[in-house]
């Protein structure tokens, strides 16, 4: 029997079931990256975009539940990290890291979840922004390697694409650079076999570096 966060995925029902979903309505975002408004509006758009992806629809039912739950939780801790800098500029540094902790807590304390499912969801929340912003990191290849040891990068790529599609923003064309190196994020790690996983992933890293000129 597959694990599910909930049987009722209607947004109004989600708000009634989970206080942290209600909280999303009161968290605004940077006007440049999120003209759509609150975290609640963005999250709903992300969920809709995710469910329209052919790759998502082709996943086994359990993986769909894992990815859907990660999408619902991906910005949950913007509520605690958002700072209004003025002029529509709102930052939320550290929301992914804190969101990982919150996701893990919810899926342990509030909704008892099998360990491997809980950790997969928590890791997706932690790294959800990496495919979009990786080239701004000091060592992008190292970051990609780090993520591949913790998260199913096929699912991470799908989540990142939905995160881009599920927003209204002026810089959306720039964000669409993701597909140009999405193959690197589609390399799946082998759970519990890190050495073999690295051997499989490193050729993709080399291709990635050549394409990006790094």
Residue spans for each PLM region:
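Proteins with a high burden of low-complexity, intrinsically disordered sequence enriched in S/T/G/P/A and R
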Residues: 1-19, 30, 34, 83, ...
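Charged substrate- and nucleic-acid-binding regions of tRNA-handling and nucleotidyl-transfer enzymes
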Residues: 152-214
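Hydrophobic, Leu/Ile/Phe/Ala-enriched alpha-helical segments that form helix-helix packing faces
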Residues: 50, 103, 107, 209-212
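Phenylalanine-focused residue identity feature
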Residues: 18, 26, 111, 115, ...
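Acidic/His-rich, divalent-metal-binding segments that scaffold phosphate/diphosphate chemistry
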Residues: 1-85
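Alpha-helical structural motif
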Residues: 6-20, 39-42, 63-65, 95, ...
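Short secondary-structure junctions and interdomain/linker hinges
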Residues: 1, 5-15, 21, 28-31, ...
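Divalent metal-dependent catalytic cores for phosphoryl transfer on phosphate-bearing substrates
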Residues: 55-171
């Amino acid at each position: 029997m597959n694990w599910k966060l909930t049987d009722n995925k209607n947004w109004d029902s989600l708000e009634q079931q989970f206080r942290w979903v209600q909280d999303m309505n009161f968290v605004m975002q940077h006007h440049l990256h999120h003209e759509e408004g609150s975290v609640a509006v963005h999250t709903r758009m992300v969920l809709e975009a995710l469910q329209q992806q052919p790759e998502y629809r082709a996943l086994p039912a359990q993986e769909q539940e894992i990815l859907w739950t990660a999408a619902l939780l991906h910005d949950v801790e913007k509520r605690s990290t958002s700072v209004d800098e003025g002029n529509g500029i709102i930052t939320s540094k550290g929301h992914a890291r804190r969101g990982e902790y919150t996701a893990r807590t919810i899926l342990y304390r509030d909704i008892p979840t099998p360990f491997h499912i809980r950790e997969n969801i928590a890791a997706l929340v932690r790294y959800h922004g990496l495919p979009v912003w990786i080239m701004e990191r000091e060592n992008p290849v190292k970051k990609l390697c780090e993520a591949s040891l913790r998260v199913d990068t096929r699912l991470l790529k799908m989540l990142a694409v939905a995160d881009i599609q599920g927003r209204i923003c002026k810089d959306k064309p720039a964000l669409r650079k993701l597909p140009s190196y999405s193959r690197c994020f589609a390399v799946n790690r082998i759970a519990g076999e890190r050495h073999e996983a690295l051997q499989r992933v490193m050729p993709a890293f080399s291709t990635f570096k050549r394409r990006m000129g790094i």
